[in-house]
């Protein structure tokens, strides 16, 4: 007897078994196909006189549901905690994003020594004058806004086969909540704010996000998102796109590292402040050339930051 095996083995010969002796039964292969192991098991069962293999009737069995989550073994010492409403929304949104957008992530390392020196110089006087602290986040956002102006096809969304180019630049900034959940307040028209305006917007939204005092419209309408994984001490990340946007930037921790720099006397090794930037983007509309060039441009703006700048 000959049969076509699911596992790619064709014309496998089982001696001593006639075609008419084989019942129709459910195989263990893909979609119930009969495999070589199934035939051998049938022959051995026939020889030993053990319980027959369960046959399949004329009515096909229902296909298993693909939407149900795989069962999880609850053996051992476990505690079951129901997701709260926000965690359920986040979970659904993350799964939907991965199913919608083919994600690609590019990385670049940036020398932000000038930026660190600038902040060290202005942070005390800024806090004394404004009554609030200045972080690196508004500078990151400023660099992103400049790069989006250079590459507007990053600031888009997708509707079927249509690319919707957004004229407003609304930057979402992912913020961790005391509960462990995540929220993304949005700085609307970030391109119309100077560095002082961005700093005040970042501080205001972050403070009210932690206090659960954001308005609904303040977490909607983003066109690009920034997430600071460096705040957890992480050096880089592979962020998931915040739908319906097509790109998200993760900024890593700033660390002192030895690096090669160019001097009038030639190359030299110096201690520099370095960080990684990682950009995840939707490969349906953002190719590696656009994504990589945009990311490099953001890094260039950070590296070229004027440490003598006033705010």
Residue ranges and their predicted role:
Residues 23-33:
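Short acidic, glycine/serine/threonine-rich helix-capping segments at coil-helix boundaries
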Residues 33, 37-38, 42, 46-311:
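C-terminal catalytic/motor cores of large multi-domain enzyme assemblies
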């Amino acid at each position: 007897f000959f049969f076509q095996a699911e596992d790619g083995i064709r014309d496998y010969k089982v001696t001593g078994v006639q075609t008419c002796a084989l019942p129709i039964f459910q195989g263990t292969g893909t979609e119930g196909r009969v495999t070589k192991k199934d035939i051998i098991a049938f022959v051995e069962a026939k020889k030993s006189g053990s319980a027959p293999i369960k046959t399949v009737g004329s009515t096909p069995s229902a296909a298993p549901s693909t939407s149900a989550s795989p069962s999880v073994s609850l053996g051992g010492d476990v505690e079951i905690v129901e997701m709260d409403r926000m965690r359920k929304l986040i979970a659904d949104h993350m799964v939907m994003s991965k199913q919608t957008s083919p994600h690609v992530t590019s990385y670049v390392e940036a020398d932000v020594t000038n930026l660190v020196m600038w902040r060290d110089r202005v942070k005390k006087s800024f806090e004394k004058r404004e009554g609030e602290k200045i972080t690196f986040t508004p500078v990151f956002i400023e660099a992103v806004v400049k790069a989006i102006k250079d590459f507007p096809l990053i600031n888009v969304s997708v509707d079927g086969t249509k690319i919707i180019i957004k004229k407003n630049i609304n930057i979402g900034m992912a913020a961790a909540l005391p509960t462990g959940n995540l929220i993304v307040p949005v700085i609307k028209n970030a391109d119309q704010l100077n560095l002082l305006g961005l700093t005040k917007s970042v501080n205001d939204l972050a403070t009210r996000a932690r206090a659960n005092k954001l308005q609904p419209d303040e977490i909607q309408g983003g066109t690009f998102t920034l997430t600071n994984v460096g705040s957890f001490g992480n050096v880089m990340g592979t962020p998931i796109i915040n739908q319906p946007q097509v790109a998200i930037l993760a900024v890593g921790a700033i660390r002192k590292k030895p690096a090669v720099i160019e001097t009038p006397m030639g190359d030299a090794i110096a201690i520099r402040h370095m960080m990684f930037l990682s950009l995840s983007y939707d490969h349906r509309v953002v190719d590696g050339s656009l994504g990589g060039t945009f990311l490099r441009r953001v890094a260039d703006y950070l590296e070229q930051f004027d440490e003598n700048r006033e705010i």
